[in-house]
């Protein structure tokens, strides 16, 4: 085990000098003597100097301190011992419930499964959320992104998906909180505890207030734990909130590492960093990882390099829209912008496919007619267009749904709608079976039967 000393500190980036014959390898973990800090080697600058990122605060460090090379990458606890626990980026417990007591530790830098090992599947994953099951159905073992600007409901949607899938699903889940609010992490922990599923979830947090090194690596820590469960033959759920903060942490340290910034100030290695993470989130012949990732969209611009790079890796994209949220329709999913690889008649069947496309056609046509309505009013439309607009407004309202996790705010009990009921309801609206009901009846209800009941009271 070689040792060196600190020669330079700039924020989270620390240069360490080692004897030339024992320079640490890239990604080796170094320990600072007399401090709790772990450093990860990023570059070899020559002359025995390595440039590292601190996995923790650099307060109290100074030049000349001794640093020991552990000779291996950062490793974290894996396996059943992690279930029901909250850990940080290094796998240390932060829930004040004693040591993890793991039997095995894995390094967080691992190769992605080879092409021959990967397995694809077409099984649908029912979420109980109408708009998602209808327009952008999820695949078991697929990757899903929830895209949205600030305050349109990414985290609430994610929490509802966790409640509906993780609680109905009997396997293990891993939640990686990457650069998000501590309050949300706390809420999530209690939500899991109250639902009695905490013993099936491993939680890994690197909050907003953590240094960039933690936020850059915490996603890999969570992923490593999920990979262990997958390789044991389980179907695992991996939730990541938020992928954008992972990119942002890379941006924060990129300039300090001496790289030239690229478009919009992002790191030049943006696509590679995203690929390293996303290529490991995959299903193999042993087991599957189904991942649901929240993606913050800066300034509501989906063409920003960060969300644009994420799009390429996903099987389904759920786009949350500020315009829909402003109408009071929650979940604010845009049914015209959201897509899924599963939306194929050979996978989901003709009835589902035609209903989904029918809903999209009606909403698209309504969008086109809005300008005419704004200028000339409804009276100038043809009878068929008037009927279409009326159905579109019903569909728009029927796409809303009360959530279990938002009961405290809305005061109305949450609803889980099966895929069969979802298809039947929208098919009925498209066929004109409910043309006689007022559009208010379709707002914030579960299945179509509730809308019929609600109409009787209006």
Swiss-Prot record:
Keyword Cell membrane on this protein? yes
Show the GO cellular component annotation of the record. Answer: plasma membrane; proton-transporting ATP synthase complex
Which InterPro entries does the entry mention? AAA+_ATPase, ATP-synt_VA_C, ATP_synth_F1_bsu, ATPase_a/bsu_AS, ATPase_alpha/beta_chains, ATPase_F1/V1/A1_a/bsu_N, ATPase_F1/V1/A1_a/bsu_N_sf, ATPase_F1/V1/A1_a/bsu_nucl-bd
SUPFAM superfamilies named in the record: C-terminal domain of alpha and beta subunits of F1 ATP synthase, N-terminal domain of alpha and beta subunits of F1 ATP synthase, P-loop containing nucleoside triphosphate hydrolases
Where is it located? Cell inner membrane
Describe its membrane topology. Answer: Peripheral membrane protein
Query: Using the chain's own numbering, where are the disulfide bonds?
Result: none
MF terms in GO: ATP binding; ATP hydrolysis activity; proton-transporting ATP synthase activity, rotational mechanism
Cite the Pfam families for this sequence. ATP-synt_ab, ATP-synt_ab_N, ATP-synt_VA_C
Question: Which amino acids does the record list as binding ATP?
Answer: 148-155
Q: Which UniProt keywords apply?
A: ATP synthesis, ATP-binding, Cell inner membrane, Cell membrane, CF(1), Hydrogen ion transport, Ion transport, Membrane, Nucleotide-binding, Translocase, Transport
Which reaction(s) does the protein catalyse, per the Swiss-Prot or TrEMBL entry? ATP + H2O + 4 H(+)(in) = ADP + phosphate + 5 H(+)(out)
Q: What does this protein do?
A: Produces ATP from ADP in the presence of a proton gradient across the membrane. The catalytic sites are hosted primarily by the beta subunits.
Q: Family membership, please give it.
A: Belongs to the ATPase alpha/beta chains family.
HAMAP family registered for this protein in UniProt: ATP_synth_beta_bact (MF_01347)
Q: What is the protein named?
A: ATP synthase subunit beta
């Amino acid at each position: 085990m070689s040792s060196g000393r600190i020669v330079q500190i700039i924020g989270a980036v620390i240069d360490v000098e080692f004897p030339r014959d024992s320079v640490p390898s890239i990604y080796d973990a170094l320990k600072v003597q007399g401090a709790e800090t772990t450093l990860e080697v990023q570059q070899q600058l020559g002359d025995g100097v390595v440039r590292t990122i601190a996995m923790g605060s650099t307060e109290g460090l100074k030049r000349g301190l001794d640093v020991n090379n552990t000779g291996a990458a950062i490793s974290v606890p894996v396996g059943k011992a992690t279930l029901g626990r909250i850990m940080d980026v290094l796998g240390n417990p932060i829930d004040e419930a004693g040591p993890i007591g793991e039997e095995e530790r894995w390094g967080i830098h691992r190769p992605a499964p080879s092409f021959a090992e990967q397995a694809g599947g077409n099984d649908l994953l029912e979420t109980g959320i109408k708009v998602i099951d209808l327009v952008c159905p999820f695949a078991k073992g697929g990757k899903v992104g929830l895209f949205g600007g600030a305050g349109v409901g990414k985290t609430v949607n994610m929490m509802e998906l966790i409640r509906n899938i993780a609680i109905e699903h009997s396997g293990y889940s891993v939640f990686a909180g990457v650069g998000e609010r501590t309050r949300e992490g706390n809420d999530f922990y209690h939500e899991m505890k109250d639902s009695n599923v905490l013993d099936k979830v491993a939680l890994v947090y690197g909050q907003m207030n953590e240094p960039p090194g933690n936020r850059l690596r915490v996603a890999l820590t969570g992923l490593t734990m999920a990979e262990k469960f997958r390789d044991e033959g389980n179907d695992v759920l991996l939730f990541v909130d938020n992928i954008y903060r992972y990119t942002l942490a890379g941006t924060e340290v990129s300039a300090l590492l001496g790289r030239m910034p690229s478009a919009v100030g992002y790191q030049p290695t943006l696509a590679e960093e995203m690929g390293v993470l996303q290529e490991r989130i995959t299903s193999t012949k042993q087991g599957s990882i189904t991942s649901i990732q929240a993606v913050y969209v800066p300034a509501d611009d989906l063409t920003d390099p960060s969300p644009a790079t994420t799009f390429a890796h996903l099987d389904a994209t759920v786009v949350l829209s500020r315009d829909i949220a402003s109408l009071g329709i929650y979940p604010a999913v845009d049914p015209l912008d959201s897509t899924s690889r599963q939306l194929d008649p050979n996978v989901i069947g003709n009835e589902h496919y035609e209903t989904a496309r029918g809903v999209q056609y009606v909403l698209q046509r309504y969008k086109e007619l809005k300008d005419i309505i704004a200028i000339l009013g409804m009276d100038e439309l043809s009878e068929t267009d008037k009927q279409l607009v009326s159905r579109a407004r019903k569909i728009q309202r029927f796409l809303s749904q009360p959530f279990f996790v938002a009961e405290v705010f809305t005061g109305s009990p949450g609803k889980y709608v099966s895929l069969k009921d979802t298809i039947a309801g929208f098919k009925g609206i498209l066929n004109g079976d409910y043309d006689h009901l007022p559009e208010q009846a379709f707002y914030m209800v579960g299945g179509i039967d509730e809308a019929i009941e609600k109409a009787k009271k209006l």
